[in-house]
Amino acid sequence: MLASRALSLIGKRAISTSVCLRAHGSVVKSEDYAFPTYADRRDYPLPDVAHVTMLSASQKALKEKEKADWSSLSRDEKVQLYRIQFNESFAEMNRGTNEWKTVVGMAMFFIGFTALVLIWEKSYVYGPIPHTFDRDWVAMQTKRMLDMKANPIQGFSAKWDYDKNEWKK
C-alpha cells in the first residue's frame, strides 16, 4: 500500500513537472492589429501611418517648413520629407532581388549531386546489363516466338506474314 501511494505521488509529480517545464517558455508578445502599421507594398501604396513616427528636432523643423510654400524647399529637403513618410520609393520596391540566383544555384547543385549519385550507382550498385537485352538474343527470341506462332489471332504472330517471311504492312 505504501509503495502504491509513493508511485502515485511520483507519477503526479512527474506529470505536473513536465507540464511546468513545457509551460514556462518565454512570453510571446502579441501583436495588436487594431492599430495601423507601416508597410511598403506595391498594391497598397499609401500606408496608414508614416514610416518615421518619432521625429528628431531637425525632422520636426522640416515638417514645420513643409507647411509653408513647397517652392522654398530644396530637393534634399523634399527627399528627407519623403523618407519620413515612406521607407522605399516605387523604384526601390520594384527593384529585382538577386534571390533568383540563389534558387537557380541551389537547383543546379541538387541536379549535379543527383547526377553524381546516379553515376556512382551505375558504377558500383547496378550489375552488368543482362544478356537478354542484347540485339542477337532479342532477334533469336522473336524468331522463336514466330516459329511457335505465339498469339496468332491478335498478337505477335498475327502481324507476321509467314508466306513472305516479313512483317505485314
Swiss-Prot record:
The modification N6-acetyllysine is found at K29, K60, K67. It comes from the Eukaryota. InterPro entries: Cyt_c_oxidase_su4, Cyt_c_oxidase_su4_fam, Cyt_c_oxidase_su4_sf. Residues 23-99 are mitochondrial matrix. GO terms for biological process: mitochondrial electron transport, cytochrome c to oxygen; response to nutrient. Residues 1-22 form a transit peptide. Keywords: Acetylation, Membrane, Mitochondrion, Mitochondrion inner membrane, Phosphoprotein, Transit peptide, Transmembrane, Transmembrane helix. Component of the cytochrome c oxidase, the last enzyme in the mitochondrial electron transport chain which drives oxidative phosphorylation. The respiratory chain contains 3 multisubunit complexes succinate dehydrogenase (complex II, CII), ubiquinol-cytochrome c oxidoreductase (cytochrome b-c1 complex, complex III, CIII) and cytochrome c oxidase (complex IV, CIV), that cooperate to transfer electrons derived from NADH and succinate to molecular oxygen, creating an electrochemical gradient over the inner membrane that drives transmembrane transport and the ATP synthase. This is Cytochrome c oxidase subunit 4 isoform 1, mitochondrial. It comes from Mus musculus.
